[in-house]
Amino acid sequence: MQRGFGKGRRSLFSCGHLPVFLFPPSKGSSYASLGLSARPYPHSFILTTEPNTLFIVMSAMTNVSSSTPSTSRQAASKFDQGEFVYNLDLVVLAVLAVLVLFSLPRAFTRYTHLPEWFQGLLLHTAKIDVPVQLDKQVAEAPITPLSRAYFSPTSPTGGGHGFNDFYTEKAYNGSDEGHGPRGNLNRNKSSGSAHANLLRNTSTSSGRVRRTHVNLPSHMQGWSSILPSVSHYLRLTIRPGLTVGKAFIVLAYTVAIVYAGLLKSNPFTQPVRSGWVAVSQVPVVIILATKNNVPGMLLGVGYERLNFFHRYAGRLVVLAVNVHALGFIYAWSIAGTFTQHLTVPHYRAGLIALVCADVLAFFSTSFWRNKFYSVFVATHIIGVVVLLGAICMHSNPSVPYVLIAVGAYALDRVLRFVKTRYAYAHLTALNELGMTRIEVPVVNAGWRAGQHVRIRVLSRGMGWFGWAECHPFSIASVAKSPNEEGLVLMCKKAGTWTTKLFDLAKRAEYGEAGGYQHGVRVLIEGPYGGPGHTLFASFSGALFVAGGSGITFALSAVQDLVQKDLRGESRLKSIELVWIVQDPSMLIPLIPTFTDILSQRTYATIHISVHYTQAGNAQSALKTLSQKPLPKDLTLHAGRPKLAQTLSSVIDQACALSLFKRGAPRKSGAGGINSTGPCGVIVGVCGPGGLADDARSIVGAVDSKRRKQVGGVEIHEE
């Protein structure tokens, strides 16, 4: 300790970095006469008392105020912490409102098409409409026999077929060998083969003809078509899962939070501000975590796309909570009053909230999410409930923010309950694909192409706690299918839960082979996600790129477009499906499904190309495939596809086919939007992150002149 003397009756000492004041009482006076009856200053403690001296050490860090009550009251009167963070939330809402305004034109265009009001909301059972009946002239049209498809097991490229008028107008026939009109994926109990299990209504009459357009959906260009250069740069990949656009939003949000935490505040001496900032963002984190959230509904995006921002906002909240708590803990530790403060109820509640926030952050890491998903979910549910309760006990002004978060969570739980269906499902193991096919016949409507559901399997075969796990899977079938197959999921065997599901499906097949009907009870929740305000059928061309199990998204989208084309509700002229697999044997179980798609009498040209990337075990599969002819326009290639060439082919066909109607405006649906030119090309991609990066690069590299000619090129990632 260093000692210093002042001229007056009070002298200043320094004890390390703490200010020490010496008060020598005068004769006949007491400490009370000096105003020191209890504690001379808030958050101070008596270092020593001697007959003529009194040492008081001021705490280096105070609660809400500064070192003196007068300055604290002045600061409080000039700066309202609660109002400040409330204004921060208003800024966040204002930014959201701007984004919603940008999405309104396309949302309005979507909902002018009446069926869109009721699609993608609730899973249900619907009466299947009678399949489209062709007029007599079309029904009696000659059918071209099926010729053997082009098959190139060594070709490294898979470019799309060239365009010519004869090709687009010709009739062709899909294979009906071994398929009745009601083949409908009925299980072949005698063979039990995956090929028979996937069998679906392959039409025996399939000449491609022009349809009468009954109710074409209106088309509205997206901002990526209006501002292609800006969109291209925003979609550049910084690292897997992070684009420039996401990074920009994250950076802007971080700047706003840091600004709110530092403006007229020192986080080391005034930790209260960081607490206010953390509490104000709790509703943001909770709302972005819900499956049914208002921002997603307004923007037309699924919860899975907002989950990235939920995780980031959650990390910032945990950081702010720790800064807030450590400021007080440090001050109490130096003052030696840590245990005394823990006897105060609201301080104990604050410590509980701190522990909950850190536990949530720890169990939210990718390790726990990927390896121990059940632990991640359990800690999240328990941790959030305790955290919100502790915040209310810790700070009364925080209650409104907590109530908003609780209201959003409660609404989500109610909607999830409403969107859940209890049903009976059939399981089929697809050995070549390493997938389990789940079919729920009783649920046949209520979803849009590209959406997914969350499923629980209520079977002891999934383990003691298998019923507690809920997993998302893309829907691989079309709603209200004339094949009456219901909702179909294809679950890739990739983890413990999906492996148990695959084994359960195998046991189910053995039971059926012995004459026993076996299935499982499931809880299906959804649908969620999907293309949002984007209408695939409103474009002139479509390219779907799928990698591995991503074929479920592509199958659903293409089958939906085929059905809409049959009803005269599609503008599409060209549909191209590219599927990238490791082994060509993965094509075998899906040949009936592809045959069904290609055999439809559609106005649009359809081509499917499958590319395998590993030739090690390809010989046996190629030998099997060579024994039966592939349907027309289904091709198999070795090596990766040239997506740029394929996209160029789709653009050419979309532009050329539109010339048939050029000069006579096409009458749109309810939107009243007419067009005499192409309505753009949509590229849908589902698969590994690298595949999505390649697709974004190819879309961004389209020449501006060709982009304008076709009406824009947009991309949808699932």
Enumerate the predicted regions with their spans:
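Extracellular/lumenal N-termini and interhelical loops of multi-pass eukaryotic membrane proteins
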Residues: 47-78, 321
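Reductase modules of NAD(P)H-dependent flavoproteins
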Residues: 68-78, 97-105, 120, 128-142, ...
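Transmembrane-helix exit/juxtamembrane "anchor" motif
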Residues: 97-121, 287-295, 369, 403, ...
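Intrinsically disordered, low-complexity terminal tails of fungal membrane proteins
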Residues: 120-222, 623-630, 668, 676
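Membrane-embedded alpha-helical bundles of multi-pass integral membrane proteins
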Residues: 221-418
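Membrane-proximal cytosolic interface modules of multi-pass membrane proteins
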Residues: 369, 374, 378, 382-392, ...
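FAD-binding FR-type
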Residues: 440-543, 559, 565, 637, ...
